[in-house]
């Protein structure tokens, strides 16, 4: 169901984009490459060119891409132009204790547009893709019932994939068991927990890296709860939750050199504008088991600085390196896993600014 319908939002979006910076693989007759004429770009929003077109379907826009690619700015402008509301689809931006290190949208944005599922959950609360999907689905339906356009912004591939294509319904894990497994992990660490998992569920152990704490704990919990491998549930038919909606996916894909530059600049800004104090407060108020598993880049490095294991410059440099590596993995994932999408490309800040300057004005 990844297709255009008869609304004009993507047509208007593409209409203002410069010739060189966009291509789409959502056209009936092949891709629009760099240098394509504006006339051919207009076809992206033409319902005659789209598959599975249905005027009865409501639209959802998903704006995805690597960290520091400009998603928040573009999404905000899109929401202002098309009477939209924004929903978070980033697994780390749900936590209320870490808005700075996760680069959550600024308060100034939230005075102009309604934002949902940002910074609402405590780190001590259990959260999963299933819980996210339930909340996101509720928000999407609320927004469309108000006659507005839901715009989801983020870079968490698992959430996006599950929302668009469906999910494997793994039984809920009891809170008592979750607490037991987390306490066990704190006591014995990753390597020994992985060894235990290998005895119970060799299939999961063969697919999960010992250093991937979150997946390791999750797989152990699932086996303890169900007696089955977490991967056995992936062979079951996926449950579709928004089959009556039409997804339109826009992928921001900056040129790599520029992306790495924006990653470095963002981390530098975040470190200077409160991230150190933010993580210091977490370290003071919470037990290590509540924050050591968080995957937001920068937390691990700042903790190393606070513990005296790195200088501030070393922590920043390490965080920048890890952010660039993460961004590269995100780009690869979106290129390979999401086929029907519109891709926006730009090589520097000037191109990005010019490309998106008043892109949604109806002419």
Curated annotation (Swiss-Prot):
NCBIfam families reported for this sequence: miaA
Region spans: Interaction with substrate tRNA: 90-93, 214-218
Any single GO BP term: tRNA modification
Xref: InterPro entries: Dimethylallyltransferase (IPR039657), IPT (IPR018022), P-loop_NTPase (IPR027417)
Positions bound to substrate: 67-72
Task performed by this protein: Catalyzes the transfer of a dimethylallyl group onto the adenine at position 37 in tRNAs that read codons beginning with uridine, leading to the formation of N6-(dimethylallyl)adenosine (i(6)A).
Catalytic activity: adenosine(37) in tRNA + dimethylallyl diphosphate = N(6)-dimethylallyladenosine(37) in tRNA + diphosphate
Keyword Amino-acid biosynthesis on entry: no
Taxonomic source organism: Rickettsia conorii (strain ATCC VR-613 / Malish 7)
Family: Belongs to the IPP transferase family.
Annotated protein name in UniProt: tRNA dimethylallyltransferase
Region of interest (Unknown insert), residue spans: 1-55
Keywords, alphabetical: ATP-binding, Magnesium, Nucleotide-binding, Transferase, tRNA processing
């Amino acid at each position: 169901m990844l297709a255009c319908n008869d609304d004009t939002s993507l047509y208007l979006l593409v209409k203002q984009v410069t010739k060189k910076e966009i291509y789409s693989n959502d056209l009936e007759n092949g891709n629009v490459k760099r240098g394509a004429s504006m006339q051919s770009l207009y076809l992206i929003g033409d319902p005659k060119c789209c598959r599975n077109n249905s005027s009865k379907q409501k639209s959802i826009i998903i704006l995805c891409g690597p960290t520091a690619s400009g998603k928040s700015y573009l999404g905000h402008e899109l929401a202002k132009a098309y009477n939209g509301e924004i929903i978070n689809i980033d697994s780390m931006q749900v936590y209320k204790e870490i808005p700075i290190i996760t680069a959550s949208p600024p308060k100034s944005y939230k005075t102009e547009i309604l934002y949902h599922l940002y910074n609402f959950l405590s780190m001590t609360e259990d959260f999963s893709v299933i819980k996210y999907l339930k909340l996101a689905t509720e928000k999407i339906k609320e927004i469309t019932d108000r006659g507005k356009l839901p715009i989801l912004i983020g870079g968490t591939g698992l959430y996006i994939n599950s929302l668009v294509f469906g999910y494997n319904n793994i039984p809920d894990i009891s809170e008592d068991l979750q607490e037991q497994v987390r306490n066990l992990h704190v006591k014995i660490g990753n390597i020994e927990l992985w060894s235990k998992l290998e005895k119970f569920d060799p299939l999961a152990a063969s697919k999960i890296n010992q250093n991937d704490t979150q997946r390791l704990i999750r797989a152990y919990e699932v086996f303890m709860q169900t007696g089955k491998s977490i991967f056995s549930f992936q062979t079951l038919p996926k449950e579709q939750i928004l089959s009556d909606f039409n997804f339109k996916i826009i992928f921001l894909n900056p040129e790599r050199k520029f992306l790495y530059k924006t990653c470095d600049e963002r981390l530098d800004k975040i470190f200077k504008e409160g991230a150190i104090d933010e993580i210091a407060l977490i370290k003071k108020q919470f037990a290590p088991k509540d924050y050591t598993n968080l995957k937001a880049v920068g937390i691990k490095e700042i903790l190393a600085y606070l513990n005296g294991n790195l200088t501030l410059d070393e922590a920043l440099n390490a965080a920048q390196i890890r952010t660039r590596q993460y961004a590269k993995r995100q780009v690869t994932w979106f290129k390979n896993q999401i086929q029907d999408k519109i891709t926006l490309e730009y090589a520097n800040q000037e191109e990005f600014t010019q490309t998106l300057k008043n892109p949604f004005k109806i002419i």
